[in-house]
Design a protein with these regions (language model features):
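Charged, low-complexity intrinsically disordered terminal segments
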Residues: 21-194, 198-583
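Bacterial N-terminal signal peptides
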Residues: 8-19
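Bacterial N-terminal signal peptides that target proteins for export
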Residues: 1-9
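Structural motif marking the loop-to-transmembrane transition
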Residues: 4-5, 14, 184, 336
């Protein structure tokens, strides 16, 4: 009886919440009819090209399509490491779109970066381009009033939310708990894909969401992240993947969301779309100017592009699951594991969360047992640079396994690393424009509460406090280079969540030059000035060391966190020119 009483209230609350989970067909039809009748149909353009701007990026993609054959595809690929080019490329492509724009993302906040992209998409819709936005509900648009305004803004703009909790745009704390208790498997399955696709010809895929910290605009903590821009036949794979997600039952239109539907039905007149209110309008104006500056685009994006052959876009299927009869849903995950398992000489891995799934552990253990195992270099987060403490704790627990059984060379990012990338230098050192590469001299550099499960989710997630001040950076890039032959840039964290629950996507480029570019980018983050190296402690008393390691191994085998305080390995500042200690 006491047990029943303990769970009676939570169960009652869940039942009350579930009673109003779905709308009636009549409510949905009525909201659809109201939006169709009263949506803003004004147009800012009457030209057949919908007033698209000229774009060297879209032009290069069109040329790649023209040069391609089924047997010999041609692609143009650009590695987007630095944040200003990554944001300017998006704006340029949105403004250059003539027919369609499809956006898929995990997080969309209403800070400067989020407002900027949303306003650009609204403008594109109003000049006649079909715009579709698909965002994961738990981490995006936590404002039913905003979504109500978007529903009326233009017939050319459609928004859907993936896997909304109890068919609502906003998840309250009690609903979050109820979602875990009543339907954990579905609640836990999130859409982690990131994609911007323009005219089914060129797309950007990778790790960046629409939030300030992904573009070096947060005042205190920003991410080192990465995308790849791909023009050519692989864009058709992107389009096919987006259609699967867009038409899946878990992707709900705005009129199907209870809190948005209620606002639509009670509107006396369609709400207007307000001008964005930027916290720092100067930097927004700057990147908007860069997005249409031919010299800037040439220096930062066109000159950095590579013309390559085979490129593939992979994505897991919607409603991904680890059930045996649904294995096809894990298509991208399977392909990544196969890539790594075929390595001959070197695997270079960058991930913010070094928490290996059982399948990944098996692959790396098998590689390390070879007579001549490949070298495995890992770039990941440190405790000082992460904002996902639970994930780091799990990584910390398995250091001995990673070093001894898998042969990893682990480098953990420092929070103030001065040269992990161009953005790092500009943000931390206040580098003036005269210090930029000569090809871009004079170019101006960039000087809400979220409920979640594990990992990075929102702008209120902050890293551990440090005694040192200044701008801090964390790692969010997810990439692999295998044998300098092919490379992957995507959203997959190589952890159990990415393996079994989140849908993931990314591009795989089969080109030596691109693999070399990506390899150099990752290795820059592992340099002594940018990262600590993880290596075994030096034994002081052999017998005590053996006892300590035995206890440590037992503690590591315990569920969840490892409580033994005397660790097998620790962090070192590696002296330049020296090799780290080996297990």
């Amino acid at each position: 009886m006491p047990v029943l009483r303990r769970f009676a209230l939570p169960l009652l609350l869940i039942l009350l919440l579930l009673q109003g989970c779905t709308l009636s067909r009549a409510q949905i039809r009525r909201a659809d009819a109201m939006v169709a009748a009263s949506a803003d149909r004004s147009s800012s353009c009457d030209r057949t090209d919908h007033c698209a701007i000229p774009s060297p990026l879209l032009a290069a993609a069109t040329e790649a399509f023209a040069a391609s054959t089924p047997q010999q595809p041609v692609h143009v690929v650009t590695l987007l490491d630095d944040t200003e080019p990554a944001l300017a490329a998006r704006i340029n492509l949105v403004r250059a779109a003539r027919r369609s724009i499809d956006v898929q993302t995990y997080i969309w906040d209403q800070d400067d970066a989020g407002q900027l992209m949303l306003d650009e998409l609204v403008r594109a819709a109003r000049r006649g381009v079909r715009v579709r936005i698909l965002a994961d509900q738990l981490s995006s648009f936590n404002d039913p009033d905003l979504l109500d305004r978007l529903a009326w803004v233009s017939p050319n703009l459609q928004v859907r939310l993936y896997n909304p909790t109890f068919h609502k745009a906003r998840t309250q704390p009690l609903e979050f708990v109820a979602g875990i208790l009543c339907c954990f498997m579905q609640f836990n399955q999130r859409m982690h894909n990131k994609l911007l696709l323009v005219d089914d010809a060129i797309g950007i895929a990778g790790g960046r969401n629409y939030q300030d910290r992904y573009f070096n605009w947060d005042d205190a903590f920003n991410y080192i992240d990465r995308d790849a821009m791909v023009g050519g036949p692989a864009a058709l794979q992107m389009a096919a993947s987006f259609e699967l997600f867009w038409n899946h039952p878990r992707s709900l239109p705005l009129t199907h969301l209870r809190d948005v539907n209620r606002r639509i039905l009670t509107e006396r007149a369609p709400p207007s779309w307000p001008a964005p209110h930027y916290r720092r309008p100067t930097r927004v104006a700057r990147v908007q100017e860069d997005a249409e500056d031919p010299a800037w685009l040439q220096a930062w994006l066109v000159d950095a592009s590579l013309r390559v052959g085979q490129v593939e876009y992979f994505s897991d299927l919607p409603a991904k699951t680890d059930k045996p009869d649904k294995r096809r849903a894990l298509e991208f995950t399977h392909h990544i594991m196969h890539m790594i398992g075929e390595a001959k000489h070197e695997v270079l891995l960058q991930t913010p969360y070094l928490v290996m799934s059982k399948r990944a552990q098996h692959i790396f253990r098998t590689l390390h047992r070879r007579a001549e195992p490949p070298r495995v270099i890992v770039s990941t987060s440190s405790l000082a640079s992460t904002d996902a403490f639970a994930a780091y704790a799990m990584s910390y627990k398995h250091r001995k396994r990673y070093l001894k059984k898998f042969g990893f060379e682990v480098h953990e990012l420092k929070p103030h690393a001065p040269s992990a990338g161009e953005d790092y230098e500009l943000a931390n050192l206040g580098m003036p424009a005269t210090h930029l590469p000569s090809k871009v001299a004079g170019v101006r550099p960039f000087s809400e509460t979220r409920l979640h499960l594990l990992g990075s989710r929102g702008s209120n997630n902050r890293p551990a406090p440090l005694q040192s001040g200044g701008m801090r950076f964390g790692l969010h890039a997810k990439s692999i280079v295998v044998d300098d032959a092919f490379a992957m840039v995507g959203s997959h964290n190589f952890d159990p969540r990415s393996d079994h629950y989140n849908t993931e996507s990314g591009v795989i480029v089969y080109d030596h030059d691109f693999a070399g570019q990506l390899r150099r980018s990752i290795l820059r983050s592992t340099q002594p000035e940018n990262a600590w190296v993880i290596a075994p402690r030096q034994p002081k008393v052999p017998m005590l060391t053996d006892i300590n390691q035995a206890i440590g191994s037992f503690s590591e085998s315990l569920p969840l966190f490892d409580l033994w305080p005397f660790r097998y390995a620790t962090s070192y500042d590696l002296k330049p020119g020296c090799q780290p200690l080996r297990a």
